[in-house]
Amino acid sequence: MTKEEILYNVQLCDVVYKDQKDIDFKSLGLTSVKWIDDKKSDTQAFVALKGKSLYVVFRGTSSKKDAQNDVSIDKVPFIKEGDKVHIGFKSSWDAVKNIILKDITKMSGYDKIVVCGHSLGAAVATLCAYNLSHVFTDTTIECCTIGSPRVGNKTFKNNYDNQKIKTLRIVHNNDVVTHSPVIGYYHVNHMLRIDREGNIKKFMIDWERAWNYLKSMVTGKNIKDHMTAGYISSLKKWYDKQP
């Protein structure tokens, strides 16, 4: 992904939290917009075209129902043998899967599918991208997420990474949500960690990461680090530093 694409994708992760009527899709360059709102699961997303790209963007936690999906830690089977994923995240994806697949199939003129989301939306986007990579096997699949929790077991993580999905999982400083669920869950590749000044943070050893996390917990900054506004602000600083 180019730096322009990364910043655009992250802005879409924020825009999807608005009511449909309040989103200026035209100014975003999006056409053929299909808005999805599953009332039962409280899962929202949109499918749209922008040039040769088809976008699928998921909203994150925005209600009590979403929060209930977040806190469950049980795992259930997914696509390949050995895949186990978070039951709440899979429930959200299952609620909208058929309509999204139908909308994508109806659209034409694109050569890649870009899936985006924040928080719970990031987890659902990860499952969506993985699912789409098994259905649209001749189409490039990209996945750009911010503030994503861990989604599944190690087998799922390995199978996902082997699908050659062009993934960028962005972590803002000490975002608390990216540390959960803890036991038996793993992150998919590839991670870009940035601090509040827009600097890329290299891999930290466990004790260093834990220390920074604890410091942020004391100050409450790890909650702020999870907000889309923080991601956008820091990524804009990162963007301005790029050649």
Q: What positions do the PLM features span?
A:
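Non-catalytic, mobile gating and regulatory segments of ester bond hydrolases
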Residues: 1-116, 120-243
